[in-house]
Structures are given as C-alpha cells and as structure tokens.
C-alpha cells in the first residue's frame, strides 16, 4: 500500500516511537501522582518530552508546553481563553473546523481575511487592512486541504504591532516547517502529536504565551487541596 493521507495522520510511525510507547506502557504509570518507581519513571518521560518540545519550538520556559488530547482540544482551550460572544475575530480563508466551529459556538463576530486563492501578497494586504478592527486573530500555518503555506510570521508581526493577540494553528506545519514561539510572539500555538511529529493518536501540544482558561477541571497531580485548578503552568491547564 502507498499511503498518502499524512495530512490527516502520519503512518507508519517510526520504530522508535513504537518502542517508546511499549516501554512506557510496561514501566511507567501515574506521572506526578506518586513517589513509587513507575510514577517517577512516567514523570521523567513527561518532563523530558516537555523539554524536547520546548527546544524544538524555541520556548524558553518548558512549563509553557501543555500536553493536550489533540489539536482540536488545544485550539478549544486557546480560543475559549480569548474569545466570547461578540469578540471580533479575524481568520484566514483556510481555517479548519477546529477553529471556525468553536468561534461560531461562542457567538464570536467572525471576519475573514479573504483574497484570491493562494495569493500571499493578497492575504497579507487583507490581514493588514482588517487587523486594526480585530480583537483576536486566529490563523493556520498550512492549509490541510491545499498545502498552501500562509505568511504567519508577517501576520504575527502585524498583530504584535497592533496589540492584537494571535493564535497559530500549527497542525500541518509542526515537524515540517519551523515553528518558532519567540519569533512569532503568539498568545497560543496549537498542534497535534499524530501528524508530522509522528506521535500516536490522542496527543497534542498547546504552547501558552499567555495565561489560559482550563477547558477541563479535575486532578492535576499536584496542589490537590484547593477546589479550583492551580494557577501555575502547566498544571493550570
């Protein structure tokens, strides 16, 4: 079989990934929830993964790396942290439903930076014209349908100059193109683990440039006495 559906999920995973997953299932359990050997082993794996991700995406504070169930989970956290009913949100014309549906469900006022298809200069002009009226910008790095690469570093710079928070959907670019947290200055960067990072299904990353609001509440494995989630990252999320 010749597999061409890598934009949805990469397959077959590298042998090293399969070995690491098998090893973790046999030796590790309950990271951050105990002092026994399996818990400490699991915690070490999580910390090492967080440090590796922070190095790959140029995040100087590893605690800003929050692990999620997938990119949809990460995007929902990011969007619901910064948008609400009536928020003026600017998006590209290439967004995934994981961006547009949460915004629609919230009742955000969505505007599209539209241009001729695959017109880099036209897209930049559309964003330049519309960012001043926006309260939030959400943009994909690469279209999952067309493979078109959007000029997100330039868009992020426009947002920074205008004081508008920027969320990047790096679902199709993480592991393929450079995703530089410090250069982007994004409020949030979301990505899955199961695409070009060659991880398993059910994994994702949210890089938190600002404080977010937890989408789910429950056991954090630390600071368990308060009724609310801890205030510090990554446990807060």
Residue positions per predicted region:
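Pyridoxal 5′-phosphate
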Residues: 1-237
């Amino acid at each position: 079989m010749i597999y061409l559906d890598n934009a949805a999920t990469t397959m077959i995973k590298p042998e090293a990934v399969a070995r690491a997953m098998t090893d973790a299932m046999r030796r590790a359990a309950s990271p951050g929830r105990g002092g026994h050997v399996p818990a400490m082993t699991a915690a070490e794996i999580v910390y090492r993964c967080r440090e590796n991700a922070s190095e790959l995406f140029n995040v100087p504070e590893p605690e800003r790396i929050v692990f999620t169930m997938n990119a949809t989970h990460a995007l929902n956290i990011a969007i619901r942290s910064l948008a609400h009913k009536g928020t003026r949100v600017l998006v590209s014309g290439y967004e995934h439903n994981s961006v547009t549906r949460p915004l629609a469900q919230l009742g955000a006022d969505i505007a599209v930076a539209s241009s001729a298809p695959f017109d880099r200069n036209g897209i930049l002009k559309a964003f330049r014209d519309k960012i001043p009226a926006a309260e939030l910008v959400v943009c994909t790095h690469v279209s999952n349908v067309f493979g078109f690469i959007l000029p997100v570093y330039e868009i992020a710079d426009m947002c920074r100059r205008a004081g508008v928070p920027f969320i990047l959907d790096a679902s199709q670019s993480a592991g393929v193109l450079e995703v530089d947290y410090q250069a982007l200055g994004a409020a949030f960067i979301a990505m899955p683990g199961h695409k070009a990072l060659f991880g398993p299904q059910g994994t994702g990353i949210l890089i938190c440039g600002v404080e977010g609001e937890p989408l789910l509440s429950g056991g954090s494995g630390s600071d368990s006495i308060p009724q609310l989630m801890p205030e510090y990252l990554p446990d807060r999320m």
